[in-house]
């Protein structure tokens, strides 16, 4: 068992090393997109399925609540948290449209729409990102594996270089924490 524990920790460290190297410029670009949107009075909309939904909700909680700094709330919406909306849209339009209908309702040009998908192939996330771009939103996708079909529709795909879902999710939450930290610093420390 100890060998497996060490192997998993080694795999985690390899993902973190990749984030530090090849993904750092893309993370910086994501921070800039979010900061610019907030400075312009826009909002953040975030979505995912399963574990990615948990990450999306975590991201939104840090923006609306706070990450590290005592500051004003930042507008952000997790698109998977209202069960009545999800079940109504899912029943009437199909599961693939549960996020795109909400983007249609809530997103405005200049908003940042973030899709999270470990496989990069979640149809409901892809449809929502496509509609968001049509509406003039900025789009970020946190992906894994080879980025799947979503990498070609997101303005800024951040692909965690792993085929192992837990490692991809660890990469995603690390990216989310970095974005939250730097957005707060840019808006409430440097921006003063």
From Swiss-Prot:
Molecular functions (GO terms): carbohydrate derivative binding; D-sedoheptulose 7-phosphate isomerase activity; zinc ion binding
Metabolic or biological pathway: Carbohydrate biosynthesis; D-glycero-D-manno-heptose 7-phosphate biosynthesis; D-glycero-alpha-D-manno-heptose 7-phosphate and D-glycero-beta-D-manno-heptose 7-phosphate from sedoheptulose 7-phosphate: step 1/1
Main location group: cytoplasm
Documented EC number(s): 5.3.1.28
Gene3D superfamilies in the cross-refs: Glucose-6-phosphate isomerase like protein, domain 1
A GO-annotated cellular component: cytoplasm
Keyword presence, Metal-binding: yes
Occurrences of domain SIS (ranges): 34-192
Subcellular location: Cytoplasm
UniProt keyword list: Carbohydrate metabolism, Cytoplasm, Isomerase, Metal-binding, Zinc
Annotated cofactor note: Binds 1 zinc ion per subunit.
Binding residues for Zn(2+): 58, 62, 169, 177
Matching Pfam families: SIS_2
Biological processes per GO annotation: carbohydrate metabolic process; D-glycero-D-manno-heptose 7-phosphate biosynthetic process
CDD domains per UniProt: SIS_GmhA
Reaction(s) this enzyme catalyzes, per UniProt: 2 D-sedoheptulose 7-phosphate = D-glycero-alpha-D-manno-heptose 7-phosphate + D-glycero-beta-D-manno-heptose 7-phosphate
Family the entry assigns: Belongs to the SIS family. GmhA subfamily.
Record's miscellaneous remark: The reaction produces a racemic mixture of D-glycero-alpha-D-manno-heptose 7-phosphate and D-glycero-beta-D-manno-heptose 7-phosphate.
Protein purpose: Catalyzes the isomerization of sedoheptulose 7-phosphate in D-glycero-D-manno-heptose 7-phosphate.
Assembly information from the UniProt record: Homotetramer.
Protein name as it appears in the record: Phosphoheptose isomerase
């Amino acid at each position: 068992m100890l060998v497996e524990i060490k192997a998993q920790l080694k795999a985690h460290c390899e993902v973190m090393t990749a984030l530090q190297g090849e993904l750092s410029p893309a993370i910086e670009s994501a921070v800039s997109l979010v900061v610019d949107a907030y400075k312009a009075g826009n909002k953040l909309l975030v979505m995912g399925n399963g574990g990615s939904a948990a990450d999306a909700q975590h991201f939104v909680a840090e923006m609306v609540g706070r990450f590290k700094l005592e500051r004003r709330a930042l507008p952000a919406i997790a698109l998977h948290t209202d069960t009545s909306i999800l079940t109504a849209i899912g029943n009437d339009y199909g599961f693939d449209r549960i996020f795109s209908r909400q983007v249609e309702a809530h997103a405005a040009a200049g908003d940042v729409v973030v899709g999270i998908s470990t496989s990069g192939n979640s149809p409901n996330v892809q449809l929502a990102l496509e509609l968001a771009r049509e509406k003039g939103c900025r789009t970020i996708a946190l992906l894994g594996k080879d980025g799947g079909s979503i990498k070609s529709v997101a303005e800024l795909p951040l692909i965690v270089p792993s085929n192992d879902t837990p490692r991809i999710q660890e990469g995603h939450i690390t990216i989310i924490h970095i974005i939250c930290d730097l957005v707060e610093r840019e808006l409430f420390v440097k921006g003063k």
